[in-house]
């Protein structure tokens, strides 16, 4: 009888072990769904897998369940790459959790209107979990936020939909962009760890780090990261070098050079890639690109994080959503500073610059919305109020190391550098917001703006016609979407008009004003497309 080889038995044992493990996990998952009679289960889903966020939400959920023993809160963290497919499947299948994180780029108007419940009325009521806070107890829930949930321009706030004129989410945090740096490496290279105050000092620091690496033979890069990280720097530089141009182009004269205005003014020829301020903004990449890691265009966000945490990169530009992971995992002291702007008197980049861009308009992030198929909508809203109370928001910020969003909540120790810069000027023109394909064009041709052969002229020659078409395509798409939105809102307006005043009439007035604005924007877009037809 032929003996069965040892490795065959080993493979069989591993297969059997895997089967047993999977069976146990499946049994545990199913038993968790069995709840005692009368227990209300609230499920909350999000894609924030950064260290500290899930722990913070778990801690707050435990506090809530201790206060309400008949309630169970279940957190559902979903990987970002699978989020969109998972979200649509859950909503269409009627199996969506009670609370879902919202983002305007993931939740179009039709999705919000069909699958989510507006929370505007609840936001106008006091938050009972602030009853012990004298300055908050009588305020509407909306006004307990540091920025009082003012609707964001262009819908970038995620929690409010300008077309539907409703609040759909209650945010949990603020996010800013900072350059994180390894204090030990900076001290070794420069003798101190004072963060740079100007762009020239930033470039000088990069040069000092590069020379330090050459002297010591260490495999060290001044700047770590990928395209994801580098665009956090270029966005700041683009937005400051072109500030005066934005003021010239802002025909609404409201200091908010919106995406709509940006695209229409481009299509009308009021500015282009050849405009001196825009051309100069493209040259900013060349000024620091020689300090980027080899192959950075092909690297991913995770690669940049690993470079920094392993001490192979001295600095990393990213959002404060990564702060918790950096501060918890780094085995070295970490500092942070805002991407330094150009001064007005900068010999090369100061001509169209006003100064540091204000972050006062930083809008609240990570909003959770209430789904229409929630079995316990009042309970879900109650938990959302608890999550965004002053006490819970302080705990969330302390554990996650993210910025607080509620009035009076202190910034956690060690994160003071993340606070939004209140003073400053309006932002300028950023070519990355020129329609859906504009960002892809930049990413695909980034190599023309960096390296030994960097040339803004070559970039413009290669991409100008691509931008021309991308902008017109985006204007046409926006006009179609606006037309559909206006059509849908007409029936809502008719219903509100015949509803008894006064409260519904107030909403009618607001919706009518928004409707007129949408129609104006659509007519402007159609006129531009008539004058500059797509070929």
Predicted ranges, named:
Residues 2-22, 424-535:
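Conserved C-terminal helix/tail region of periplasmic/extracytoplasmic solute-binding proteins
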Residues 37-51, 71-76, 99, 168, ...:
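Short, well-ordered beta-strand elements
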Residues 50-70, 180, 184:
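Short, polar/charged alpha-helical segment
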Residues 72, 188-189, 303, 328-402:
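Extracytoplasmic/periplasmic substrate-recognition and gating elements
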Residues 77-86, 199-201, 296-310:
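Short helix-initiation/N-cap motifs at beta->coil->alpha
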Residues 107-176, 347, 353:
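Hinge/lid segment of periplasmic solute-binding proteins
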Residues 203-206, 248-298:
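Glycine-centered hinge/linker elements that transmit conformational signals in sensory
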Residues 211-214, 273-345, 379-388, 394-395:
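Ligand-binding pocket segment of bilobal, Venus flytrap-like solute-binding proteins
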């Amino acid at each position: 009888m032929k003996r069965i080889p040892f490795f065959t038995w080993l493979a069989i044992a591993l297969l059997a072990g895997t089967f047993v493990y999977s069976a146990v996990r499946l049994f545990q998952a199913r038993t968790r769904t069995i709840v005692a009679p009368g227990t209300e289960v609230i499920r909350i889903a999000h894609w924030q897998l950064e260290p500290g966020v899930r722990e913070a939400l778990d801690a707050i959920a435990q506090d809530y369940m201790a206060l309400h023993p008949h309630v169970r809160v279940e957190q559902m963290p979903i990987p970002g790459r699978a989020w969109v497919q998972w979200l649509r499947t859950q909503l269409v299948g009627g199996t969506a959790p009670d609370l879902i994180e919202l983002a305007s780029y993931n939740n179009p108007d039709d999705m919000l209107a069909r699958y989510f419940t507006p929370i505007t009325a609840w936001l106008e009521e006091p938050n009972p979990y602030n009853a012990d806070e004298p300055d908050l107890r009588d305020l509407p829930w909306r006004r307990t936020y540091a920025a009082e949930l003012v609707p964001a321009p262009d819908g970038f706030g995620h929690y409010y939909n300008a077309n539907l004129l409703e609040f759909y989410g209650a945010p949990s945090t603020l996010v800013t962009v900072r350059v994180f740096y390894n204090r030990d490496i900076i001290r070794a290279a420069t003798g101190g760890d004072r963060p740079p105050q100007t762009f020239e000092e930033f470039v000088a620091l990069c040069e000092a780090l590069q020379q330090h690496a050459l002297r010591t033979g260490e495999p060290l890069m001044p700047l770590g990261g990928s395209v994801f990280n580098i665009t956090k720097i270029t966005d700041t530089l683009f937005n400051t070098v072109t500030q005066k141009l934005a003021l010239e182009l802002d025909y609404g004269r409201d200091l908010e050079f919106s995406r709509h205005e940006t695209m229409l003014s481009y299509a009308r020829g009021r500015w282009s890639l050849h405009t001196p301020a825009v051309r100069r903004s493209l040259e900013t990449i060349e000024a620091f690109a020689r300090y980027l890691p080899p192959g950075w265009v092909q690297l991913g966000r995770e690669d940049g994080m690993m470079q920094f945490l392993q001490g192979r990169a001295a600095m990393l530009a990213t959002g404060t959503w990564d702060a918790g992971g950096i501060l918890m995992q780094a085995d070295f002291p970490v500092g942070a500073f805002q991407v330094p702007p150009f001064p007005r008197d900068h010999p090369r980049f100061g001509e169209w610059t006003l100064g540091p861009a204000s972050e006062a308009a930083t809008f609240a992030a990570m909003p959770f919305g209430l789904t229409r198929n929630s079995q316990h909508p009042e309970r879900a809203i109650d938990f959302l109020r608890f999550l965004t109370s002053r006490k819970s928001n302080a705990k969330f910020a302390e554990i996650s190391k993210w910025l607080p969003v509620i009035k009076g909540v202190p910034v956690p120790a060690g994160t003071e550098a993340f606070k939004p810069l209140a003073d400053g000027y309006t932002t300028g023109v950023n070519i990355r917001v020129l329609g859906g394909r504009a960002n892809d064009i930049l990413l695909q041709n980034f190599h023309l703006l960096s390296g030994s052969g960097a040339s803004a002229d070559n970039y413009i020659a290669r991409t100008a016609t691509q931008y021309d078409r991308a902008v017109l395509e985006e204007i046409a798409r926006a006009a179609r979407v606006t037309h559909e939105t206006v059509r849908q809102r007409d029936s809502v307006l008719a219903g509100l008009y015949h509803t008894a005043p006064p409260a519904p009439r107030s909403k009618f007035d607001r919706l009518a004003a928004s409707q007129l604005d949408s129609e104006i924007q659509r007519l402007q877009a159609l006129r531009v497309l008539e004058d500059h037809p797509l070929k």
